[in-house]
């Protein structure tokens, strides 16, 4: 098993953990924050949960495609960008929602837009790599 296959398995596991974590975030927003009357914080946590589920599934699909050698010639930068972006974006929103007056929340709040930029960059790179793979395959035919 080569290094790329190991990293692909790592990203599948990370994606699955993000989906599981997102389910818990959604439950916390619905049952804890809404019960306390903190609707805005609950909405932020819901956004973090939704992004976590979608991006976690995306990580799993991208890593599985790489594992099946669809993108074997390319480094796994889309997964790295998506994983880091998800951590900054959803993690920052979750911290701001669950502990709004804490130092951690103050430190992570500026990371939220950076995470969004990394998420977008990751998907742009997916598009570029896919076009490159299709171009190379069509060139060989």
Provide a role label for each language-model segment.
Residues 76-96, 108-127:
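Hydrophobic alpha-helical segments of small multi-pass membrane proteins
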Residues 63-75, 98-101:
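Juxtamembrane helix-break-helix junctions at the cytosolic face
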Residues 17-27, 43-68, 80-91:
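Core segments of alpha-helical transmembrane spans in multipass integral membrane proteins
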Residues 2-8, 35-38, 70-72:
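Helix-boundary and loop/linker segments of multi-pass membrane transporters
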Residues 5-19, 73-82:
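Interfacial segments of alpha-helical transmembrane regions
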Residues 52-62, 117-129:
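Hydrophobic cores of alpha-helical transmembrane segments in multi-pass inner/ER membrane proteins
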Residues 1-4, 134-141:
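Short, charged juxtamembrane terminal tails flanking transmembrane helices
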Residues 30-44, 93-114:
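Interfacial helix-loop-helix junctions of multi-pass membrane proteins
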């Amino acid at each position: 098993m080569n290094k790329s296959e190991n990293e692909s398995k790592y990203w599948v596991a990370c994606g699955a953990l993000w989906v599981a974590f997102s389910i818990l975030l959604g439950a916390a927003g619905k049952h804890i924050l809404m019960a306390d009357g903190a609707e805005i914080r609950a909405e932020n946590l819901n956004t973090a949960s939704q992004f976590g589920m979608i991006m976690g599934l995306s990580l799993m699909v991208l890593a599985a495609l790489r594992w099946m050698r669809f993108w074997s010639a390319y480094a796994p930068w889309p997964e790295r960008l998506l994983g880091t972006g998800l951590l900054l974006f959803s993690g920052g929103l979750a911290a701001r929602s669950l502990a709004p007056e804490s130092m951690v929340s103050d430190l992570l709040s500026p990371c939220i837009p950076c995470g969004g930029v990394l998420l977008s960059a990751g998907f742009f790179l997916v598009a570029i790599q896919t076009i490159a793979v299709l171009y190379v395959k069509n060139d060989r035919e």
